[in-house]
Regions:
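Short, compositionally biased "basic patch" segments
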Residues: 55-76, 90-94
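Gly-rich Lys/Arg/Thr-decorated short loops/hinges at beta-loop-alpha junctions or inter-strand turns
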Residues: 72-81, 106-108
Length: 238
């Protein structure tokens, strides 16, 4: 058993497991990535998403991730995963920029983020820029939202909703594009400076179309809730 205690300067907040086994065809990697903790107590209270795959692209990235953990190396040398502190925020900002450009070109566009809180100044300013360009943005934020929707000239194309119920909304989902062609990512990282700049976090794409539709269907149901859903108003009330 080799225990790696992580980084001195960064909190490890990612949730990843990689099992390597020998088969008749060679080495196989079974990779699990999650939005929630490996904690038997909070697992009974939190709602999260877990992804398990034998795709070797994920396996190679997971192997590289654990190698970097042992070396205290904040590398960005990954094929498919985004790893904070170097990649997640820049890739989110680039994804928002891409939707702004699509709007300017008259193409279908849109943005969706599900997060526990949104406090990062860079991301908020970029979302405001997207709204000013006319991109519709939906933010599913259970906790703190430092962006106020519906402000003329700034956030009139931003919608912020929250669900607080018996179980804690804990999954993080990023969506870039219109509903029928949205690129979906799952992540351990909230849209907070501490998560994206000061922690080791992972975000990864949902490439399987069936899984993508399951996630979008789950979000459709959540956003149509008529009992627990609350919407943030321009005056700060819900």
């Amino acid at each position: 058993c080799n225990v790696i205690y992580g980084f001195r300067d960064f909190k490890v907040h990612s949730k990843i497991c990689c099992i390597t086994r020998q088969t008749d065809q060679g080495l196989q990697h079974i990779t699990q990535l999650g939005t929630g903790n490996y904690n038997e107590k909070t697992a009974k209270l939190y709602t999260d998403l877990s992804f398990i795959t034998t795709d070797e692209t994920f396996g190679r990235d997971a192997t590289e991730f654990f190698r970097n953990m042992g070396l205290e190396n904040t590398s960005d040398n990954y094929d498919i995963m985004w790893v904070a502190p170097l990649q997640i925020k820049p890739m989110i900002l680039a994804g928002i920029d891409a939707q702004i450009e699509r709007k300017k070109a008259g193409e279908p566009c849109g943005l969706f983020f599900k997060t526990n809180s949104i406090t990062d100044k860079d991301v908020i300013e970029k979302i405001v820029e997207a709204s000013q360009a006319g991109v519709d943005v939906t933010l599913f934020v259970r906790g703190i939202s430092c962006i106020v929707p519906g402000l003329e000239g700034y956030t009139e194309h931003v919608r912020v909703v929250s669900i607080v119920g018996r179980l804690l909304e804990h999954s993080r989902i990023y969506g870039f594009g219109p509903r029928d062609n949205m690129k979906v990512y799952l992540s351990s990282a909230d849209l907070m400076t501490r998560n994206m700049d000061k922690r080791i976090e992972i975000a990864w794409p949902v490439l399987d179309s069936e899984l993508r539709e399951q996630i979008l269907g789950y979000l459709d149901v959540s956003l149509s809730d008529t009992a627990k859903l609350r919407e943030l108003m321009p005056d700060g009330s819900y």
